[in-house]
């Protein structure tokens, strides 16, 4: 599978990049195959247009994972996501997997904040993308993926209950990408 990972240098992106070593990473941070800011990138730039045109799937992780970040960060995440969805549609990318969160529908009596609303918008964009023939988008409500497993015993119970280890993370992303656990394309999945 030819995979592009937007947000390849973040906590989850690095894990997916390791699991899919032939993928192309796009990130604002150094170390990515393509260094670009989704807020300002020219998607017609040859290297990006070629990566998207050749992609079987794009994984979009290039958003803040901080539910308490200022609202303008989450507004920008929505704008960046919309730009990426439009570029994928133009390039004919058959599948997009976008990281959502259970903050889109919070538990424990918490109210939905800008972070949660931004995830709802990304879920709506995924549904809209999937309306076109030959296209599919999955909004995956990712659990808590700490930077280090050392954080798990220190976390409150509600967060530990939502913990995804690397095995679960990779299993869920493979499924969202239409792959079997051993990395083969699942029967009936778009290429």
Sequence positions of predicted segments:
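N-terminal Rossmann NAD(P)H-binding glycine-rich loop of SDR-like oxidoreductase domains
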Residues: 2-22
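SDR active-site strand-loop-helix element
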Residues: 6, 26, 61, 96-102, ...
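Rossmann-fold cofactor-recognition segment
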Residues: 27-43
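NAD(P)H-binding glycine-rich loop region in Rossmannoid oxidoreductase-like domains
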Residues: 40-76, 103-105
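NAD(P)-cofactor binding segment of oxidoreductase domains
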Residues: 69-96
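Active-site helix of classical SDR
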Residues: 114, 118-121
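Conserved beta-loop-beta element that borders a ligand/cofactor-binding pocket
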Residues: 125-148
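Alpha-helical substrate-binding/gating segment
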Residues: 144-149, 162-190
């Amino acid at each position: 599978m030819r995979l592009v990972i937007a947000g390849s240098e973040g906590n989850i992106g690095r894990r997916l990049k390791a699991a899919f070593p032939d993928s192309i990473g796009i990130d604002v941070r150094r170390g990515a195959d393509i260094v670009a800011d989704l807020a300002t990138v020219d998607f017609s730039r040859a290297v990006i247009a070629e990566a998207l045109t050749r992609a079987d799937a794009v994984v979009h992780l290039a958003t803040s994972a901080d539910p308490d970040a200022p609202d303008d960060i989450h507004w920008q995440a929505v704008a960046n996501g919309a730009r990426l969805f439009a570029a994928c549609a133009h390039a004919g990318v058959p599948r997009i997997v976008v990281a959502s969160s259970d903050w889109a529908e919070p538990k424990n009596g918490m109210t939905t904040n800008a972070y949660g609303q931004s995830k709802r918008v990304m879920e709506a964009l995924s549904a809209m993308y999937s309306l076109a023939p030959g296209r599919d988008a999955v909004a995956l409500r990712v659990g808590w993926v700490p930077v280090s497993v050392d954080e798990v015993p220190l976390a409150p119970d509600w967060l530990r209950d939502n913990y995804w280890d690397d095995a679960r993370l990779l299993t869920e992303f493979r499924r969202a990408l239409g792959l079997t656990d051993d990395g083969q394309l699942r029967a009936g999945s778009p290429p």
